[in-house]
Amino acid sequence: MGRAKIKKKSMFIDMTAMSDVTVLLLTFFMLTSTFVKKEPVEVFTPASVSEIKIPETNILQILVDPAGKIFMSLDKQPDMKAVLEKMGEEYGVKFTPEQEQKFIVASTFGVPMKSMPKFLDLPTEKQDRILKNEGIPCDSTDNQFKSWVRNARAVNSDLRIAIKADANTPYAVIKKVMNSLQDLRENRYNLITSLKTTSEK
């Protein structure tokens, strides 16, 4: 006598709830994550025990690479546009609407004013390659760094200044940046550092 065959039943799992959770999580991370700006150079900040959080808005960030080149960034596009216009007036440099648009969407800037129009005409990939070898002048004969800070403050009085320098940046360069800020009576600023681990303390 043959054995009765048991019919195989197909399993059906309703994945609707799982897909809903996935979409919710994805939306949550997209809305709560902060945009990390692309920087022209890689900077390894020195370690410290300070846990003060830098504000995410109204920030003027000053980036100093190991070679002492200075770059800057503003977090608001209207501020970027207004500051560029003021710098153009101060240095007698005119910008086309296309050049202005390229500037305000850039995450970081750092070329001398006389080179700025030609720089902004370049494709983004070429700009990235050139920018890391430039830097904002900050010497006694041509301190454009001070002009950028002064005009940024004129555009947005609520700006917070943050300096992000590499651990191997020469102290003389940082001192020059700080002296320039003091000349403008900008005596309040944050130094961006990485948090020391327990083994480093």
Regions found by a protein language model. Give the residues of each.
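GHKL (Bergerat-fold) ATPase N-terminal catalytic module, capturing the glycine-rich phosphate-binding loop
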Residues: 2-3, 66
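Hydrophobic single transmembrane helices highlighted by the model
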Residues: 3-40
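Long, low-hydrophobicity, acidic/polar, solvent-exposed interaction domains
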Residues: 36-201
